[in-house]
Amino acid sequence: MADSTRPLLSDFNSSESNLPPPRSLEETIERCIGDFGWAQFLQAALVSFAWFFDAQQTFITVFTDSQPMWHCDNSDRVDSVCNTSSSNLCTLPNQTWSWDLNPHVSIISEWGLQCAGSFLKGFPASSFFLGCLIGGLALSTLADSSLGRKNMLLLSCLIMSLSSMLTAFSTSIWVYAFLRFLNGCGRATIGTCALVLSTELVGKKWRGQVGAMGFFCFTLGFLSLPMLGYINEGNSWRNLYVWTSIPTLIYCCLVRSFVRESPRWLIVKGRKEEAVSILQSIASNAITMSFTNLCFEVENDQSKSNPDVYDALKILVRKSWSFRRLLAAMVVGFGIGMVYYGMPLALTNLNFNLYLGVVFNALSEFPAFLITFFFIDKINRRDALIGFTALSGISSALIAVLGQQLGSLQIVLELVSFFSACTAFNMTLIYTIEMFPTCVRNSAISMVRQALVFGGVFSPVMVAAGRENQFWSYGLFGLIIGLCGLFVFGLPETRGSVLCDTMDEEEYKTLAKRQFIG
């Protein structure tokens, strides 16, 4: 079976006949493109920059949906019933108070939602994450089946940018929530497509570093929002959606014109001439190999003339080993996602300055990125994930044990827990890339990313319960990520492994590894 499924390279020029034939498509591609050159770097950087816009749309509601500050009118009067520090805004007559800034700075003040229930206030944000879940399930397999990585990335960015632009013209919270849902549907596959495409354009030596570039761009996008919010202070919240949508539209044009499709995906789909052309365009200048007679032989796992868009998911579930890997990775992702999305929300439960806490949380993503970038090729994936999930869980549980008396120590533990969750978040995505072959890789990583988002869906409820007792927020955060992290023991180690392209090739590699160990 191994001989019939492994990719082969044939018909070398006579000048290359002294070179041993590569044993896999991975070696063939690395031999073609050579060392990591400028062409590959520019391709990876352009693709990874999609994460920048992804982060902006994920966290933009921090500013657009916030509760504005207000003040009492004529509060110096003896008979005044208004007191900013002790009065409930909803019990005061409208003529006794005013917003500090223009009512159009937030959807809360513009649409008079200050006294609405927590469900209605949070409905747009919930709609966004619901869109992420549905969009991820509905669109993720298209990158493996019919559209490919590049076209799926382009479509996702286009949907996200257009829906963001339309959001600026919302006339009610219901229209606003629907457009946020549509925005989430488009945004759902951006991170996975960008990560998979950027790593498939380079060899395994630089795979981890290139994957970490996307995480760095995501952090930059997150940090760009406070700057935009400061510039827009006192003006309409609609400006933020316009300002973030226009650059995304420009980025779509750049992707359409300059980004190359994954040569791995093209080869698996039988489009070998296009793959050779792309390999030639991104090859290092030092490579002199002739591409004219380059020939790949790859068995297509989806040998159908008209493949179903959900073929990749069917293959993942049909094979017992891939289903076990996917299930374990999703459980790990669920626990990590709950802490990653829940920790910033739970800052309001700590006895610490909220603004400084948010800034520290955002900045803690930088060391998480640096560790991923510089050490991803030096550390075992399983050991690192177990260590970071355990550290995050212990730190989070200690916050609940200490209580609110030690505010400074609590924020230190919170930052340690959030930093560990960020690092585990990054490593989980790279780990998933290495565990699954090209024919199902995008679908697998999309499912794991949906598990991360699904974990975040429960975080707001736990944070609300934790206002009375921190065990229900930080205590459960620590317990869940710690238990979910144990599922890493069911996953294979992938550091330094070759990326496979078909299910049979992955099975052969796993079998050979077991026989070697045995």
From Swiss-Prot:
Segments in the Cytoplasmic topological domain: 1-32, 144-157, 198-210, 260-325, 377-383, 432-443, 492-518
Region Disordered, residue ranges: 1-23
Family annotation (Pfam families): Sugar_tr
Membrane-side (Extracellular) residue stretches: 54-122, 179-180, 232-239, 347-355, 405-410, 465-470
InterPro entries linked: MFS_dom, MFS_sugar_transport-like, MFS_trans_sf
Tissue: Mostly expressed in siliques, mainly in young seeds. Present in stems (cortical cells and parenchyma cells), at the basis of secondary inflorescences, and at the base of trichomes.
SUPFAM superfamilies: MFS general substrate transporter
Induction statement: During cold stress treatment.
Molecular function via GO: ATP binding; transmembrane transporter activity
Binding site for ATP: S198, T199, E200, L201, V202, G203, K204, K205
Record GO cellular component, one term: plant-type vacuole membrane
Membrane topology of the entry: Multi-pass membrane protein
Keyword Oxidoreductase (UniProt): no
Principal subcellular localization: membrane
Spans through the membrane: 33-53, 123-143, 158-178, 181-197, 211-231, 240-259, 326-346, 356-376, 384-404, 411-431, 444-464, 471-491
Location of this chain's protein in the cell: Vacuole membrane
PROSITE patterns with a match to the protein in the record: MFS (PS50850)
Glycosylation site list: N83, N94
UniProt keyword Transport, yes or no: yes
GO BP of this protein: cellular response to cold; monoatomic ion transport
Alphabetical UniProt keywords: ATP-binding, Glycoprotein, Ion transport, Membrane, Nucleotide-binding, Transmembrane, Transmembrane helix, Transport, Vacuole
Function: High affinity carnitine transporter involved in the active cellular uptake of carnitine. Also transports organic cations.
Membership in a protein family: Belongs to the major facilitator (TC 2.A.1) superfamily. Organic cation transporter (TC 2.A.1.19) family.
Protein name: Organic cation/carnitine transporter 3
Protein source organism: Arabidopsis thaliana (Mouse-ear cress)
The gene coding this protein: OCT3
